Amino acid sequence: MKIFAVIVTYNGMQHDWIGKCLKSLEQSTMPVTAIVVDNNSTDGTREYVPEHFPDAVWFPQEKNLGFGQANNLGIKYALDNGADYILLLNQDATIHPDALRLLTDASDGESLLSPVHLNGDGTKLDEMFRISIKPKDGMLFSDLLLNKKLEKSYETGEICAACWLLPANVVRKIGGFNPLFFHYGEDNNYYQRLVYHKVKTLLVPRATMCHDRVFYGNEVAFNKNKYRRDVLLIVLNINYSVGNILFQLVKLLLRTYSYDFRNYRIGTFSFEMLWLMSHLRTILSARKTDKSTGISWLN
């Protein structure tokens, strides 16, 4: 079984993130080949990784491609080199030594898999994971509270892409990340596409990883182009009809004025609508691509 782990780095030396991340892969009980795609770091990451982890496949970039497109480079390399599974792992994340074994044991080969996301020191659930996890039938919480034997996996809703295990079959069906998203939102869009193509998301409760971040990660990066991202997540949601898209855009406008007023800049929403109209052909083409199956966005 060939497993590749794709890690996108950008100034990954802070808090020794990239060192801890790659060391956790070396300690995995299942062999895994690391693919590191660096988004033009300036903090020594570009020197540190090839020197200390010479077995990692190293793809330094001359500009910041963003999270999705950088991952696409690593995903394509993994597929081209016979990957059975592709692990997407954040630079600020580490996996438990048995995580890959437990994830692959629970795999049906046709579903996305995720371990339980813990905080940086592994003492509690990652905050975003805690508030977003939604098992489909409630049996996970029932089994936990009643101290029953846990199943290998439980179907769930959307899970952050800090640690995704993608069977190659899923990637060949769904493709890579949509390049219209630069940083944040690309995993939400990918989940929308999984839902459209009826690909399940499975949580493996005995597998764990640690995500060393504050609540919203990089707050500056998260808030940058927030409204563009919100608009894109609506208009590129291939589960929505035209009517539903218009309804969701109106809701976004009302929320912008009612709840996000402090962060609202005069004309922001109108500007995003003008941008949307000027890129309508690109949006429609992207929706068509996302509705098709195949290795879209990877060529």
Residue ranges with predicted function:
Residues 61-81:
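Glycine-rich, basic loop-to-helix element that forms the pyrophosphate-binding segment
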Residues 23-32:
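Short, acidic, metal-binding catalytic loop of nucleotide-sugar glycosyltransferases
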Residues 223-299:
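Non-catalytic, C-terminal membrane-associated alpha-helical segments of glycosyltransferases
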Residues 157-175, 180-208:
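A short, conserved alpha-helix in the catalytic core of glycosyltransferases
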Residues 83-94:
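Short beta-strand-to-loop acidic/aromatic patch adjacent to the donor-nucleotide binding site
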Residues 133-157:
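Short, flexible, basic/aromatic active-site loop/helix in glycosyltransferases
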Residues 24, 38-46, 63, 93:
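A conserved acidic beta->alpha catalytic loop
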Residues 96-128:
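Conserved donor NDP-sugar-binding/catalytic core segment of glycosyltransferases
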